[in-house]
Amino acid sequence: MANTQNISIWWWAR
């Protein structure tokens, strides 16, 4: 699974 930090930036800066 992806890390929380990665997800945060992923959907936040998609």
UniProtKB/Swiss-Prot annotation:
This protein is involved in control of the biosynthesis of tryptophan. The keyword Amino-acid biosynthesis applies. Keywords: Amino-acid biosynthesis, Aromatic amino acid biosynthesis, Leader peptide, Tryptophan biosynthesis. It comes from the Bacteria. It comes from Rhizobium meliloti (strain 1021). GO terms for biological process: L-tryptophan biosynthetic process. This is trp operon leader peptide.
